[in-house]
Amino acid sequence: MARKRQRRRRRKVTRSQRAELQFPVSRVDRFLREGNYSRRLSSSAPVFLAGVLEYLTSNILELAGEVAHTTGRKRIAPEHVCRVVQNNEQLHQLFKQGGTSVFEPPEPDDN
């Protein structure tokens, strides 16, 4: 009897793994397509955007970790992130243009 050779399936390599990113490239791609920003989208655009988002996030978290450490805390709190964005001129300019700030305290309800 002849034996059948079993082919080993290759593991699927995600676009995030190919680009060595932690952020999900496929999800960024889906958001770009659903957002109707353009009729056509290059295959490298979501990879680049995911890389930029990952860079900004890691930069903010690194600075917030330093602020938390200097205040004697072991965890990063929203106040630490807020302080980083307010004290860093480039980050402040970036988030200032967004309109509504997530760092402002919410207005109390009248209920």
From Swiss-Prot:
Classification via SMART domains: H2A
Subcellular location: Nucleus; Chromosome
Origin: domain of life: Eukaryota
GO aspect biological process, one term: nucleosome assembly
Cited function: Atypical histone H2A which replaces conventional H2A during late spermatogenesis and is involved in the replacement of histones to protamine in male germ cells. Core component of nucleosome: nucleosomes wrap and compact DNA into chromatin, limiting DNA accessibility to the cellular machineries which require DNA as a template. Nucleosomes containing H2AB1 only wrap 130 bp of DNA, compared to 147 bp for classical nucleosomes.
Subunit structure as annotated in this protein's UniProt entry: The nucleosome is a histone octamer containing two molecules each of H2A, H2B, H3 and H4 assembled in one H3-H4 heterotetramer and two H2A-H2B heterodimers. Incorporated into nucleosomes during late spermatogenesis. Interacts with H2BC1/TH2B; preferentially dimerizes with H2BC1/TH2B to form nucleosomes.
General remark: In contrast to other H2A histones, it does not contain the conserved residues that are the target of post-translational modifications.
Name of the protein in question: Histone H2A-Bbd type 1
Species per Swiss-Prot/TrEMBL record: Mus musculus
